[in-house]
Amino acid sequence: MKMLQGRLPLTVLHLFLLLGGGMTQQRPQGPIKDINGLPAQGPTVSVRPGPDPSDKVTFQDCPVDIFFVLDTSESVALRVKPFKTLVTQVKEFTKKFIDKLTSRYYRCDRNLVWNAGALHYSDEVILINSLTRDMKTLRDNVETVEYIGKGTHTDCAIKRGIEEVLIGGSHQKENKYLIVVTDGHPLEGYKEPCGGLEDAANEAKHLGIKVFSVAISPNHLEPRLSVIASDASHRRNFTATSAVGLTDDEIDNTIDTIIDMIKENAEQGCCTYECKPSRGLSGPSGPPGYEGEIGKPGLPGDRGLPGDPGRQGDIGPVGYQGMKGDQGIRGEKGGRGAKGSKGDKGKRGIDGVDGQKGEDGYNGLPGCKGSPGFDGAPGSSGPKGDPGPYGTKGEKGVPGTPGTGGRPGNTGNTGDKGDPGSNGLAGEKGESGDEGDAGADGSPGKRGEAGELGPPGVSGGRGARGEKGEPGPPGDQGRDGPAGPFGDPGEAGPQGPKGYRGDEGPRGPEGPKGPRGAKGLPGEQGIAGERGDDGRPGNGTDGFPGFQGYPGSRGDPGSNGTKGYPGPKGDEGEQGEPGDDNVSPGPPGPKGAKGYRGPEGPPGPPGPGGPPGPDECEILDIIKRMCSCCECTCGPLDLLFVLDSSESIGLSNFQISKDFILKVIDRLSRDEHVKFDADNSHVGVVQYSHGQTQEVVAMGDSSIQSIGQLKEAVKNLKWIAGGTWTGEALAFTKDNLLKRFTLEKKIALVLTDGHSDILRDKTPLNTLCEVTPVVSVGVGDIFQNAPNSDQLVQISCGGKPYSKGLSLQRTSFAELLDDGFLHNVTSHMCSDRKCPDYTCPITYEGPADITMLVDSSTRVGNQHFQTSKSFVKLLAERFLKAKPPPSGSARVSVVQYSGQNQQIVEAQFLTNYTVLEVPVDNMQFINGATNVVSALRAVTELYREDSLAGVNKKLLVFSDGNTQEEKGLLKVVQDAQSAGIEIYVLAVGSRLNYPNLQVMLTGSAADIAGPFPEERLFRVPDYTSLLQGVRYQSISRRIALKSSQ
């Protein structure tokens, strides 16, 4: 219809020129000028002089307002390296578009001209240029655009563009366009401040502004771009960037397609039937045409003039109500009115129809573990058992308590929607409108001269079928029609799931007595009862005695009777003759009864001393193995989280980041026994995006006094969705959070995608390095870009000598919640745990020279000798790595011995364990006799030659007391004592020579020596036990103590 309206004026004009006759086509003589004396724009027509020679025309402009809305947010500026690449491509796209905005002449004698403007936006809107026809200035201003790089408020930008084209644009309201170039992010997560994207798009539609949406690829959000576009024809997968492999020709084709659509729509708007350009000069007469076809019947003529009024007639009878008259003839169209003034802003339009159902969202995170379910339904009945024996009838049971009411079952699924009802009855036809007033009589036109009949025209061929036109804009919402009858009820929905088993209901009333059952089978015979009591004697009198019976038959012989009882004791006999003499004693008599308890005797002498009980080292080891309080602790510490809340993180990833923080806190509390409260460890969280957007929640805030309140505050953090200024956020943490946390041990964890805008944010990324260790965790962003490892290394103080930081990377945010990763993070935070000191440390009260005399004889054997070497190394390490004495040092010697003159000094008074370890490892088993006397003599000589004066001299002898030469043992021990040597003995095994051990420990003969000095004798059951437990700690600590001599 619009196409017909646009061409109708041209058809009428051509017909009028043909009928006018006498027209000739002339070439313009020189440049044609408009009424102001300026050269006319566009094609011109010269007309033969008529009644008014000055009637020269100009072509009216057909203005089109086009406004560019350019996205320069973080998701565009920082998505592709090098940064600003996509912003540069967007600017190039806009400049190419501007270059192609050239004027065009329409056949309705109107000239298309462009008014163009632009803005760019992020979380703020910056006007590049208002609407102008100066394309060069607009192009230059676009070239100077610098990206904002923060959040994305597309709704605000579109509404600002609407404002610009309405206020600064032309009066041609149907020729207003917005070109929105964006990636569509973010999809969700925060309240858009200007009413939302759909609200902005609907406002543009209601105001007749057509919106094209052009994608910034890759990873654009197509659903959001479809919402922005006025309809599908204004989207068409338009793309402004070459990051997805598009060529320049393909981008140029996008621009040409949009411009062609605008020009075609503008022609329909400018070239309508209302277009009445001034009449041009008559052209030359054309050749006579062929005779035309017989015309169709003409339209009804105008109504004639009313006749003169007749005379007054007689009053007739009252008539019946007449039928409603036919509709009056439509009056002629009035002339074009003057241009109206701009109207007031219209009221808010009606709400648009509901949009289609959105795509399914991403799967939610696994929920928390549910509460225990209700008891399951009872199992199916088992097979019927064999009938048992009939029991005795039981007593009547106690009436049960009424049960509570059962829980209602779950509501079943809603049934399918019923079929729509049939259409309602059509409403009554409305009454015709009142008859219109008659139009003014037109002046009769002059009768034209009849033209010559032309020959019949040749029938034209059938034209090609026209292409289907674009769908028209949606019409206004119709008024609600009458409600139809209710539809038939829908089919019953599928049966709902079986509800949970309800609780046992109350006991019902006793039912009626059932019919008597069939006679049961006979039961098994019962066990015979006990004999009943004798009955009471009868009441009758004694009967008379009966007659004597006949004698019975002879019975069988009886059995032998039992032995009779002994008879009475006889009289005492006469004394017998004396027997022969017997020199052997008789047997001893029986033991007498136990006598009475005698008086308490005097106390006995003291018994020998028992073996020594566990010493301090052994007690500490027992405590360590039995007591949970001996575990190492991580705290107290101050824990700082710095959380990236920028747009490139995405809402779902931001939620995972908060869950990660909460899980780290929980693991530190549970596994590392960190206690978070005001007097122990503290936690603080800083979330950030671009400049001045930091937000901190920490223990110690007025509303956060416990770890539970802090967790709740972390859960309530809202996604900022702006730029990424990590350096500024770290400086904010240093200035605002670290000042509040004053514990010596602290650590910061920075969670980011590693894409900080270092072009805008000049704060160094290693700001926290000098004040606290930093763990940087980098995770890929929503565009699947890997984190920037260089930035992560800077954040975690990589390459600094004082650094205790750690840099970790993950592909996706879901990996943050993996148990293994959480364990690694918390283990690093607690790498320097504070553990109780159960090593039983050595304490020297003065300088000491310690010698270990190792048995290398056949009695020991090579395998046990190797065990002795390992034990010697443990002792030596303890002696030499302990805290040195206040003055001087501790020195250690190692000597092995066997037979006569078989003593080897392996290490002589060394102070460095590393140096001593090598000769001990190289010790070779001698495998000779056992001569302790010769060994003690050699060691005494060693002390006299190399030991320092004023030091404590200690000697540990590996011996079980057995020696080939016992005669000189006492003397060499006394010589050693006189040299100031204190002797300790390590005795292994059960075959010990205690007399010799007593001589070695006391320096006295075995028969006159006092009790064993147990503090200097170390008994070990076997060589394997040497390396078990804390025996080496006990022995070394006891040797290192001050001498007891």
Swiss-Prot record:
Species, as recorded: Xenopus laevis
Chief localisation class: secreted
Keyword Signal tagged: yes
Bias type Low complexity, positions: 297-309, 375-392
GO cellular component, one term: collagen trimer
Ranges of biased composition (kind: Basic and acidic residues): 327-360
Region (Triple-helical region): 280-540
Record-linked InterPro entries: Collagen (IPR008160), ECM_Assembly_Org (IPR050525), VWF_A (IPR002035), vWFA_dom_sf (IPR036465)
Subcellular location as annotated: Secreted, Extracellular space, Extracellular matrix
Any GO BP annotation: cell adhesion
Comp. bias regions, Pro residues: 600-613
SUPFAM superfamilies membership: vWA-like (SSF53300)
Biased composition (Gly residues): 400-409
Domain VWFA: 65-255, 638-825, 849-1035
Function: Collagen VI acts as a cell-binding protein.
Protein name (record): Collagen alpha-1(VI) chain
Residue ranges of the region described as Disordered: 277-613
Record family assignment: Belongs to the type VI collagen family.
UniProt-listed CDD domains: vWA_collagen_alpha_1-VI-type
SMART domains from the UniProt entry: VWA
